[in-house]
Amino acid sequence: RADESTVTFLDDGRHFIVRQETDAGYMHLYLYDIDRGLVRPITRGPWEVTALAGVRGQQAYYLSTEVSPGQRDLYRIRLDGSGKVRLTEGRAFCSVAPGAGMDYYIQTLSNASSPNRVEVRDHRGRLVRTLEENAELRGELARMKLPEREFFALPTERGDTLRAWMIRPADFDPARR
């Protein structure tokens, strides 16, 4: 379905980007010309583009599951599909609030083992300023010595993969029953 979350018009007045499902069932980005129709796919692969964060010149910024289905990373790619760069680091779930023209954006990173970190970054992904480190909460959680979550995948009889996690007691001993 075409709406503001799946269609983005470019400043040239002639092109737009559509986030749509491929034949294989993955959401990807496609460049269209208003008069000629489809120009080319911008992204492709066995992973999802979950959002188009913005466009800056001839580059698209998008969030995807390329590293892992349980992770979101921000990428930059040229509209011709070349020059893809992952802008996020580590293992986290990234969300982005883009500024005008993607000159700057606010990036929120979260994961199961640490509190959110909120940063301002420039269009190259360079850190400009940390808005929220959550250092006090991070320290308090470390003092509590909470057990870590263990993430894993379970294959089904149909060939699907179910993602799961488990928390074991802090004093867990796998040899003890």
At which residue positions do the language-model features occur?
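Beta-propeller domains
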Residues: R1-R36
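A short beta-strand motif characteristic of beta-propeller blades
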Residues: L38-T43, G83-T88
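Non-catalytic accessory segments flanking enzyme active sites
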Residues: R1-V7, R19, T50-V55, L63, ...
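Short loop/turn segments that connect beta-strands within beta-propeller blades
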Residues: D33-G37, R78-S82, H123-R124
